[in-house]
């Protein structure tokens, strides 16, 4: 199972890099950058001209303050339950499953781990 997750993660990164046509500059001044908002749970794993990859670990009961992600791909490594509150929307509880992937457009949101297991996500943010 872990081997499949690692292979899937590598494939996701390769696809993201292969799709790059233009480079969008990353705003290092963004006050909603999750690396600034929640540095204890969001770690920079890789950054180049095309992508920024965040290794995210959200413990049970933890609420992540309002933050922003550009469009990109999330790779889930653990099963966990998360309450997602998108800007201007009602909160939704979602189940994340290990080994699954999810594309999302740019988002501003707050998340809360409402389950009993740590959420582990690799967030691949595209810079184009």
Residue ranges and their predicted role:
Residues 1-9:
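Bacterial N-terminal signal peptides that target proteins for export
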Residues 10-15:
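Hydrophobic helical h-region of N-terminal Sec-dependent signal peptides
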Residues 88-106:
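Short acidic-glycine-tyrosine-enriched beta hairpin
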Residues 61-64, 100-112:
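Histidine-centered metal-chelating micro-motifs
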Residues 38-67:
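Mature N-terminal segment immediately following signal peptide/propeptide cleavage
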Residues 69-88:
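Glycine- and acidic-residue-biased ligand/ion/polar-headgroup-sensing regions
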Residues 79, 106-128:
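Ligand-binding loop in jelly-roll beta-barrel domains
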Residues 16-31:
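Bacterial Sec-dependent signal peptides at the C-terminal "C-region" and cleavage site
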